[in-house]
Amino acid sequence: MKVKIETAANIIVILVAVVVGSVFLKDRFFSTPPEPNEVKAGDKLTNLEGWDWSAHDQTLVLGLRKGCHFCEDSAPFYQRLTTQQQGGSNATIVAVFPDAADAVKEVVQSEGLRVHALAGVPLERLKISGTPTLLLVNRSGTVVNAWIGMLSPRQELEVMKATTEPTAADLKLPDPLAKK
């Protein structure tokens, strides 16, 4: 009789341990991870100190960080972008860094980037969770397109095309509803 009671108690302890363990393991290993807070087209960005979205038809934001090897590896593409900008791009390029001003100046000069550079910008304010991140932003501060990480040649072409296509302001089409 004593053996049966001990066996029953052991079985109950094991069952309770399995139930409690499965609850913790389920939450730990099988729960849905939270959505990343990454920027996407349609997001409205807050104003940046030192930058006015409305002063530019489009702004191409380069979210960079000193020491980011993907940013360094992408520097030749960023140089081509700045050359394109001088040749008629409709997007103003601004590089934002979370780093201090002296570090930003060093990166911009060493990589030969001809861009507006803003230092000390918390990248989270722009919903940038990793570098490099490129954002095409319209004059109302809305993200038109976003590219995250080191870009493939196809993505580089997308960026080049997006920054050379005319905007609605460039087209200056007549308003069909305007009174004559």
Set out the residue ranges of the language-model regions:
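Thiol/disulfide oxidoreductase modules built on the thioredoxin-like
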Residues: 110-111, 120-162
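Short active-site neighborhood of thiol/selenol oxidoreductases, capturing the structured segment around
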Residues: 51-72, 78
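Short acidic-hydrophobic, aromatic-tinged amphipathic segments that line or gate anion-handling sites
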Residues: 45-50, 114-121
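Short, low-complexity, Pro/Ser/Thr/Gly-rich segments in the mature regions of secreted, periplasmic
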Residues: 167-180
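Structural beta-sheet core signal
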Residues: 62, 93-95, 136
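N-terminal targeting signals for export/organelle localization
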Residues: 1-44, 157-163, 180
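Structural microenvironment flanking redox-active thiols in thiol-disulfide oxidoreductases
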Residues: 72-111, 177-180
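A short beta-strand-turn-helix
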Residues: 39-60, 83
